[in-house]
């Protein structure tokens, strides 16, 4: 039986539920003239909730790595946001790259849904630079590709830990920030705001949407992409039961994600924000709201109507399986923090890995 993961357009596993939003107006521009930090001490303690200008701090890898990152279980994790318990290191960035390629494939090779709308909003206008904001930029792949595609636009990627390992175009930059601290310093500055797979690190999804709206210029576009962890049958309606809860049939992928997301919610994450994205977001300053869900196979065995479509499905299934396997492995730190026995977690991971490429 084919297992499918719904993508609406996101979360670490898929492309789920994009919402494309356009404001009729936007709040006034925030005055940044007094903010020019040259050292972290001049800004504030990054662990303090009073620090709202972390994006304006220039990071020096030799000086500041210990301030932003700590080591645990052989992986690196961010220090800014206690809700986000996934790693922030090169293996995780590699997983992000696979997820990025998966989402592009599901979108027919595009970097975004509704390409005609997005490209119209980002069209080159003399004497006016376009601006793109990516919230939760991960490995930076999306930002860099957007900067190369739209050379007349400035691209800003924001994340808890930026990936500094790849060449960056001159019209692209990355900034450290905990977006839960607010984005008022970005208000009214961007033609496109892109957010993908961030809800597990967001503490107040409603406020987050308000900030996204604030960052948009009039007639700008927002794209939110979140994923659904629940695996579905081929009818794309019936979810698989969770393994280990009675009966002989069930999904260990679904089970371990269920356990992880319940822990995230108890810690204060707005995991259910993904469901809000799927339903469609509504705000008094937004119009032309659109939403869609995409499904990708959880394994490389799906068959399409044509050879080309079959090749696309197999590529998506392979990337999804690798992404899912690496994602579940990255959850160990979250489970350990919650006090789960390592033997139980290891058993879950073994079951996920054993079944990921098993068509039955």
Where are these regions (language model features)?
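Conserved S-adenosyl-L-methionine
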Residues: 275, 286-299
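A short glycine-rich, Lys/Arg-flanked "PGG" loop and its adjoining helix->strand segment in the class I
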Residues: 206-223
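A short His-aromatic
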Residues: 200-202
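A conserved beta-strand element that flanks and buttresses the S-adenosyl-L-methionine
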Residues: 194
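Oxyanion-hole/transition-state-stabilizing segment in secreted/luminal serine hydrolases
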Residues: 197
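Short alpha-helix
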Residues: 269-284
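N-terminal charged/capping segments associated with class I S-adenosyl-L-methionine
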Residues: 2-189, 207, 227-248, 252-255, ...
């Amino acid at each position: 039986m084919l297992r499918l993961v719904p993508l609406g357009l996101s979360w670490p596993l898929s492309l789920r539920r994009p919402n494309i939003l356009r404001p009729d107006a936007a709040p006034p521009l925030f005055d940044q003239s007094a903010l020019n930090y040259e050292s972290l001490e001049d800004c504030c303690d990054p662990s303090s909730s009073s620090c709202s200008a972390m994006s304006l701090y220039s990071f020096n890898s030799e000086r500041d790595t210990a301030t932003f990152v700590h080591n645990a279980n052989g992986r690196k994790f961010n220090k800014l946001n206690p809700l986000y318990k996934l790693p922030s290191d090169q293996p995780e960035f590699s997983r992000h790259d696979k997820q990025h390629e998966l989402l592009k494939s599901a979108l027919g090779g595009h970097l975004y849904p509704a390409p005609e709308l997005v490209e119209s909003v980002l069209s080159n206008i003399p004497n006016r630079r376009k601006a793109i904001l990516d919230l939760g930029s991960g490995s930076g792949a999306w930002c860099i590709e957007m900067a190369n595609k739209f050379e007349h636009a400035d691209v800003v990627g924001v994340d808890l830990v930026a990936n500094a390992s790849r060449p960056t175009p001159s019209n692209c930059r990355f900034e450290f920030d905990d977006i839960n601290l607010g984005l008022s310093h970005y208000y009214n500055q961007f033609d496109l705001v892109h957010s993908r797979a961030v809800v597990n690190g967001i503490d107040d999804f409603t406020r987050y949407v308000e900030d996204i709206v604030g960052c948009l210029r009039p007639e700008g576009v927002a794209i939110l992409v979140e994923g659904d962890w629940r695996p579905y049958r081929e009818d794309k309606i019936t979810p698989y039961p969770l393994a280990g809860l009675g009966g002989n049939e069930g999904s260990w992928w679904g089970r371990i994600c269920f356990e992880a997301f319940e822990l995230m919610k108890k810690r204060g994450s707005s995991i259910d924000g993904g469901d809000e994205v799927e339903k469609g977001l509504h705000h008094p300053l937004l119009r032309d709201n659109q939403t869609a869900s995409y499904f990708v196979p959880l394994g490389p065995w799906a068959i399409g109507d044509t050879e080309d479509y079959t090749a696309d499905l197999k590529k998506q299934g392979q990337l999804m399986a690798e992404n899912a396997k690496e994602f579940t492995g990255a959850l160990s730190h979250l489970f350990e923090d919650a006090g789960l026995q390592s033997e139980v977690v290891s058993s879950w991971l073994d079951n996920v890995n054993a079944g990921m490429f098993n068509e039955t």
